[in-house]
Amino acid sequence: VPVVVAHGAHTKDLIPIGTFLRRSPHLMAIQTAIGETVRSATGLSSITPKNDRVIRTEVVQMSDGRIHGVQMWLGAPDEAPPERPLVGSLMWDLTAGTATDTVESLQVGGWDPAKQMTHGRAFAEDLPRRELKRNEAEVISMVINPEAGVTICDTWDVIDYRGEPITVGFVARSVPETQD
């Protein structure tokens, strides 16, 4: 079931799309567009059945090709979509304690993509360098005692590589890896 993790720049707490758009006459068309985007692993533009709205989607994809999400915009056919918020996929190997990033996830997380490697970065580098808040401690417990099915949606206030404060929104899910 697709869930909403953000609306514009505002993080949402994994709201099922049917709940988030419960009164929208375009819900079915949006669900279809999301499904087609995931199946084709490419963004699309489609028109709603009444020809009054355009749905535009973009894939959020990990470097190994796995789809981590879909960004979606709905607007009038003659309206230009706003600039999409930058999003990036990141995968933590809870067994090895390492992270695999995309360039976008490094940028969103406040890292300098020109100086950070995308594979094999120590998980500990992602942790805030100060006293932890409760929600941050939950993520650390996810690493120390990995349990399948744990999902966390949150924001962290961090300092980026330029010394600027930023807020990073994220979703973390703990799922067992299957061997290919």
Region spans (language model):
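Sensory/regulatory domains in signal-transduction proteins
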Residues: K12, R22-D180
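Charged, amphipathic alpha-helical stretches
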Residues: V1-R23
